[in-house]
Amino acid sequence: MKTTPMTFANCPQQPHGGVLVDRVVPEAQREKEIARARSLPSIRVDLEAVITIEMIATGVLSPNTGFMNEENYKSVLNTGRLADGTVWPVPLSFAPIGDRNAEVIRQLSVGDEVALTNVDNDPVAILKIDDLFDYDKTERARQLFGTTDRSHPGVDSIYRRMGDVSLGGPLTLLQRADWGPFEKLRQEPKDTWNLFYTEKKFRSVAGFITGANPLHRGHEYIHRNALEEIDGLFLQPLVEMAKREYVRHEYRMLAYRSVLDTYYPKERTILSPLRVTYIFAGPRETILHALIMKNYGCTHALIGRDHAGIGSFYDKYASHSIFDEFKPEELGIDVRLFHEVFYCTRCASHATTQTCPHDTKYRLNISGTGIREMLRHGILPPKEVVRPESARIAIQGVQPKGINNDGHGTLPVSKVVQSMFPYYAEHTRLGGSKRLQPLSPEEITVRDLEAASLDARANATNIYNDIYREYCTLADHNPGMQPAWVNEARDSMIRHQQMVIGDLQEKVQQAPEQASDEFMYQDKSEASRELEVAKALLEQTPPAVTEDVLQERVWNPLPYQRYKGKDD
C-alpha cells in the first residue's frame, strides 16, 4: 500500500520517528480490498483490538506500522525502546485468544496475509505476517506492570484477552470503527496537524489527556497555566474502554463543553475525544500518552499527578519520575509536570505544595475518585473542586448511580471524606480548631460527608473574606469605607463592658472575705477574679474607628503641592 506522507517542514513539531504513519486503504481501493480480505484466512478480534488497529493505521502510534515482531516486542518490554533505539514504552502485540483463532494461527506462516474481522465478521484490516512467536505472560506482566497480581487490571487483561502466540507485521485498515455519538467530533492526526498549523497558525500546542473524570478545577489549573505561554490547548478526554465505575463518556464530553463554552478562550481551545485501548500500565502509559500527543501535533504534554494511575499499585508521582529515564530530545515533546492541585481557603486560590505553605486544615482536595463518589451520594462537590456547570451534568451520568444497601458507594464513606476533605477527621471545621479526639474511619458516616460538604459550601470563601474584612477595618482610613455598624457595635460593647466593670467594682467592695453560701454568694477573692476577667475583656475589645483616629493616619511632612511638583 502506497500513500503520500504528510510533510512537516514548516511545523514546530514532528511525528514520533519523523513520519506520520498512514496505513488506511485509499477510498478508491477500499471495496476491492474488503472483497479480497473475505477470501483470506480470518481471525476474529474484539473491540479493544479494533481500536488499537485504527490507532496504528491512522498514525496515532507512529512510527509503528503494525503489530510488533519478536525483536521489537522484547526490546520494548525490557528497555522501553524499539530495537532501533526509538523510545516506545509499551509493546504493541497481537496474540488472539480462542480455539478457532488458535486453529487459524497454526496454519499461518511468515509472508501470509490474514483478515482481521470484528464481532459481526466484517473485515476490519489485513495483517501481513512478518513474525509468529511465543511469549511469556508472567514475564510480560512483571516487566510491563511491575506486578503479576491478577487484581491489577492490566495483568488480568493479559490472561483474559491474550492467546499464546503473537503475530507481528504491518496492517492495512479497511474500515474505521463507528464512534457513535463521538463520530462528529472524531479527529485523526492528519486533521489536527492541519488544524493547528495551517488553519489556526499556532506555533505551540499543549496536549492534555484525561480519563474517567469530568472536567474539574485541578484540570483547569493546569490548562490555565499552559495557556499563559502556549498558543493552543488540545483536550482529549478518553472515551470507551474505561473502568467499570466512571462518569459515562457522553456526559463527560458534555461537562467539558459546558465549562469550555463559559470559561475558556474559544479560539485557542480544541476538544476532541480520544478512543484508545486502556493498557493500565501506569508510568509507562504516561510516556505513551505523551507520544500520542506528539503524533497529534502537540509541542507540549501536560501531565498531572498520578497520570494513568492504577489504585495503589504505583507511587503517586511515578508518572513524573519515569521521564527521568529518557532524554528530552528522545521524546521530542516538552513535558510539563504538575503537582497535585488543591484549593487552599487561606490562600483563596488553587495551589500545589510547591506554592502554598498552609496546613491541610485549610484545604479542599481535588480527587477524581472522591468527586465520582460524591456524585453517587447525590452531592455536588464544592465549587472550588468542580464548577457547577460540570458537576450538574456529571451527576446525571455517573455509573453506578446511587449507593449500595450498606450506605456506601464503590468506596467506604470514610475514604471519600478523607480524599476530599483532609481536615475533617482532625478539625471541627474547615480552618477550625482540632477535635479533642480525631475521628476514626469506623466513626465516619454519610452524615459526616454531608456535614463536610455543607461546611465547604458555607466557609470555603468565608475564611479569606473574614481575614480581608479584619484588614480593611484596621487599614481603611477613608471615612466612607468604614462600616458604621461595626463601629457602632464596638462602641456598644465598650459601653456595656464598662457598665459590667462598674457593677463588679461595687460588688468587690461589698463582698465578704468569706461567703456564707459558696454557691449562692461570692467572697471577695471570687468577685475580684470576675473583675479581672471583665477588665481583660474590655482591653481586648477593638475600639471604634472614629474620624479623629482616621485623621491621625493621614499626614505628610511637606505641603501637598510639593508632591505635585510645585515648589513655589
What is each PLM-predicted segment?
Residues 476-483, 513-524, 543:
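Charged, low-complexity interaction regions
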Residues 491, 498, 505-507, 511-515:
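Long, leucine- and charge-enriched amphipathic alpha-helices
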Residues 2-432:
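Active-site cores that bind ATP or allylic diphosphates and position pyrophosphate for catalysis
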Residues 551-568:
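Long, low-complexity, intrinsically disordered segments
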Residues 465-496:
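Acidic, low-complexity intrinsically disordered segments
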